[in-house]
A protein has these predicted regions:
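Structural recognition of the beta-strand scaffold that forms the well-ordered cores
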Residues: 8-11
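Extracellular carbohydrate-recognition regions
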Residues: 13-51, 181-201
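Short beta-strands within extracellular/lumenal beta-sheet-rich domains
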Residues: 69-91
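A short beta-strand element within beta-rich, extracytoplasmic domains
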Residues: 83-107
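Short, surface-exposed beta-strand/strand-loop-strand elements in extracellular ectodomains
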Residues: 105-124
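Extracellular carbohydrate recognition and processing domains
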Residues: 120-150
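Extracellular beta-strand elements of beta-rich domains used
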Residues: 140, 173-175
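Short beta-strand-plus-loop segments that form exposed binding edges in beta-rich domains
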Residues: 155-167
Length: 201
């Protein structure tokens, strides 16, 4: 379905890369990664509502990182100088990494938000329909990246569009699948069995 152009949301992590880098407009746990805005004819502004924030390495019941932060907005242009948001990661090791973007769907969202991924193999561009899919991770593709932090390894978002006057939103980028971030409790039954086993020894 993806090869045919469909947007497929998979609840299970698709990437076997154990490293994970999250870059967000509200800050990064990896302080060497960076979110940068470049303003031209239109200015980036704070969005109304809640966005993503990477506040902790693990999450428990009822904690939703997509409701704990903010996001940025900008009006699209058809002509003139574009404004760019950049997510610049520090890659821990050479390898293949899945790239995901997060944004918020708002009234008059753009249907062709232009993302560009700079990677080891060159440059790949994607037009994302932000009228849908806000508040989650949207998969762009898997790419090779070299270790370190440089301008040849980043994700950008432009406000250039086929339609002027729409809204593009910028929030977070995730690179790599990681090891999971849901803190799982030990079941009472399992804990009881372990105690019984230890009593017999």
């Amino acid at each position: 379905l993806e090869n045919a152009g469909a947007n497929v949301l998979i609840p299970r992590e698709r990437d076997c890369q154990t490293a994970e880098i999250i870059i967000d407009n509200d800050g990064c746990l990896n302080t060497r990664s960076a979110y940068v805005e470049n303003t031209a004819d239109k200015a980036w502004m704070q969005g109304n509502g809640k966005g993503f924030a990477h506040l902790r390495s693990q999450y428990t019941d009822f904690e939703n990182p997509f409701k704990e932060g903010t996001f940025r907005t900008i009006e699209t242009i058809k002509k003139g100088k574009e404004s760019i948001a950049e997510w610049i990661p520090e890659i821990p090791q050479n390898g293949q990494y899945a790239v995901y973007v997060s944004y918020q769907t708002v009234p008059n969202s753009s249907d062709d938000a232009l993302y560009t991924v700079y990677h080891k193999g060159g440059i790949s561009q994607f037009k994302v329909n932000q009228k849908m899919g806000g508040g989650t991770w949207i998969y762009l593709g898997t790419f090779g990246f070299d270790a370190g932090k440089n301008n040849t390894c980043k994700v950008t978002l432009s406000n250039r569009s086929a339609k002027a006057g729409q809204i593009v939103t910028a929030d977070a980028v995730k690179i790599g699948g990681g090891m999971g971030n849901i803190a799982r409790r030990i079941s009472e039954e399992g804990a009881t069995d372990n105690l019984k086993s230890s009593d017999k020894t």
